[in-house]
């Protein structure tokens, strides 16, 4: 029998199997499974609004990791304790041109405002390895996963890194922001980032922006 000839079809989403005109016992089994799945979903939904606490009453902070604004569309900020990681690579791969300062600032601002005062950690660009970006990462690098990527790529392209740092500093006035720097291997790399961020901060002050220095974390 083909699916066109069947008057009733059950599709098992777990196994990918389809049952054409199944017997009554099969229908009842799938109805039972459907009820069980709905009950599990209801129990999980009820737990979302409760604080995360271990069996010995230890509170645990639950923060979400996101890779773009779309991840926040259907998420209530009150159900988590903030954003634990924002991967900014999506901004650099959406079009033919690299994102300018205002574009980045607007995205970071929306994320921070969504959190409603809860902490937000944004990671600077971690391009390279399995995340190449045309015109930015190095083609044909012998060791792309551990070579010029993360902070090393940012420091090698300070004109691009400076734009991201300025956007982050401007967005920091909208809520508690932390900046994560990826792939740091030696203290000198972090010192260089601090220097560039300090320069960007002072440039913004001279231009008249109100900024707050975000915490810098690894």
Q: Where are the regions a protein language model picked out?
A:
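Beta-strand/loop-dominated core regions that host nucleotide or nucleotide-derived cofactor-binding catalytic loops
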Residues: 15, 22, 29-31
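Conserved alpha/beta-domain cores
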Residues: 39-218
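Generic detector of well-ordered alpha-helical segments enriched in charged/polar residues
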Residues: 27-32, 152
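Conformationally flexible catalytic loops at phosphate/diphosphate-handling active centers
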Residues: 1-8
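Surface loops and adjacent helix of pleckstrin homology
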Residues: 21-23, 125
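Feature 9007 captures long, charged alpha-helical oligomerization segments
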Residues: 33-37
